[in-house]
Amino acid sequence: MRRAEAVTGGGPVRGPRTGRPTLEEVAERAGVSRATVSRVVNGQTTVAEGLRQAVEAAANELGYVPHAAARSLVTHRTDSVALILPESPNRVFSDDQFFPSVIRGVASELDAAGKLLVLLTTGSAEARSRAERYAVGGHVDGVMFASLHDADLLPELMLRRGVPVVCNGLPHLAAPCIDVDHLGGVQAAVEFLLAKGRRRIATVAGPQDMVAGRARLDGYRQALAAADRRAIVAVGDFTAESGHAAMRQLLADEPELDAVFVASDLMAHGALQALREAGRSVPGDVSVVGFDDIALATYCDPPLTTVRQPIAEIGRSMARAMLRLLEGHEVEPLTILPTELVIRESA
């Protein structure tokens, strides 16, 4: 069999030219000094309108773009903000819709303000070190954190280095924090199940090294204690796999349970699968309530009753707080966004 040969045509392909227009070339084209061009491109308002227009016209003709690093030395601004997610890329870019919703909220606000979003994942020690060097090295104007774990020291380190910080999930930091009403949302869910006549209400709690995991478990315990009911607890890590495993554990430990509050919709999806495998009907045998109201909740079988938290609004609120910090304004130390119970067919 004859081998096909590669066909080439023309000369070698070269990369883009490395010589970029300089301030001096713009100044010569505009007929002004280099200092005048520098003031115009750095946004200073002390330049006469006619000179500014001449500089802008010359820059457009030459295709001049200000060098970001050099400009930041003058303005002390990079016009970019980092969002750090202390998870692995595999977790952030998975079927967990919490992260894309937060990113979308942050990006929409920063884009409207003319700022760039820098996304960093720090699921390993090496990634955390890289993020630390990047942020404290002056590459961004501020850092936002979401999905924080107790052991994560980066927020405190950033604050000590003078980096503006906004977080979701660690209210004890000396930085603005955006969170949701975990307690109120969970208590509404448990009270709904009690009103339905459910007597043995279990929970699949979230990770206990996160504020969301602890607060939702606290809300569950408080609501059951008020009704003089016993807590039945298994713990997951906000993944579907952990919800499946925790539900199997609950059925083995408490076969008579008739309801379960699951601390995330993704874990609830896994719990529903475990209930089907065990031959339990939902909501006939066991009622199920989740937390998040991500798109998955409407696709579950049956559609999931859940506590809606405004995930994209968490991102938008974080970005707005950061923009206010960067402008030198005061920001509320703690913002709590409301939750609401969305009733569907699983309970």
Where are these regions (language model features)?
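Periplasmic-binding protein-like
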Residues: 140-146, 202-204, 234, 254-264, ...
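Flexible loop/turn connectors
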Residues: 248, 253-347
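Hinge/beta->alpha junction and helix N-cap segments in small-molecule ligand-binding domains
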Residues: 88-99, 119-128, 178-188, 204-248, ...
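Short acidic capping loops at alpha-helix termini that bridge into adjacent secondary structure
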Residues: 199-201, 228-231, 282-287
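Alpha-helical recognition/docking segments in bacterial nutrient-uptake
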Residues: 1-9, 18, 80-84, 88-191, ...
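N-terminal helix-turn-helix DNA-binding module of bacterial transcription factors
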Residues: 1-79, 347
